[in-house]
From Swiss-Prot:
This is BRISC and BRCA1-A complex member 2. Residues 275-364 are annotated as: UEV-like 2. The keyword Cell cycle applies. Residues 30-147 are annotated as: UEV-like 1.
Amino acid sequence: MSPEIALNRISPMLSPFISSVVRNGKVGLDATNCLRITDLKSGCTSLTPGPNCDRFKLHIPYAGETLKWDIIFNAQYPELPPDFIFGEDAEFLPDPSALHNLASWNPSNPECLLLVVKELVQQYHQFQCGRLRESSRLMFEYQTLLEEPQYGENMEIYAGKKNNWTGEFSARFLLKLPVDFSNIPTYLLKDVNEDPGEDVALLSVSFEDTEATQVYPKLYLSPRIEHALGGSSALHIPAFPGGGCLIDYVPQVCHLLTNKVQYVIQGYHKRREYIAAFLSHFGTGVVEYDAEGFTKLTLLLMWKDFCFLVHIDLPLFFPRDQPTLTFQSVYHFTNSGQLYSQAQKNYPYSPRWDGNEMAKRAKAYFKTFVPQFQEAAFANGKL
């Protein structure tokens, strides 16, 4: 159900509270997922004119789970705070003295419900952390992370229910990784989503037993960061080592991700240097180039009255990855009506060369390759 449809069914006096939750409500580490509501119902009599829904189920992303709490207002007394039912978490009994926004409920503040939900989630986090005491190993993992502010202050924990047969229970740690994305070129962060939310990397580590014999890590990137780093398949994190600890493993993943970000930033500056060198060496032979991301360059060149195009595609992780050179005849066509072309990646190249050296080497390679390309164009293409 879309937020707008849900809000149209809410009692008008309660609508500001719910609007703040579903439109602006981001609670916890997963900034890519908003709060949402379902199961709208009314406690009013059937004679009460609508819209009159005053109770609903609130879905809250937390540590890779979705908490489903029932929130119950009274449309007849909209100035009163709501009641809460915590679904399957019957053992969760929040401390009323710590719910300051509930104790001093201010119906004139549209965000008062959202503020109470945030306080409840904080208490729920403490409740889950307390459940780890049943396992000395999992408690050790938690306490060692807690000693490092960069991890301890950005962590959510969900401890699964205890297995009555084995006495075991699972636990999941969700951590917001302290990786700086601010220097990623802005062109890579565009056109992903109208409201992409915060740029964030979350590491989920699931312990399927209390002795950490089955541990499953997974990395989640916000949409813009995933796009900027080359897609979901571009980054593979290492398996959790047998006998390893989170306090050793998490910095490894941070280091891997930081290096990936640096590769992207370095690639952008190196591509710009590369294209600047080609502009200098080839001058009026440059037909067009990508002046934003510096990922493409097209040259129009001539060799013994034979005109041809060279399309240069620079990869995201340039200079580590070699550019592709595509030679294209301006005279010859394939059977499908396309200009005859050949792509080349087997040419002299070193990622250690600067842009000027790459341009000089490319010019030398063009002179050696063009004769055989011209011959192939005449042999395989049609005028």
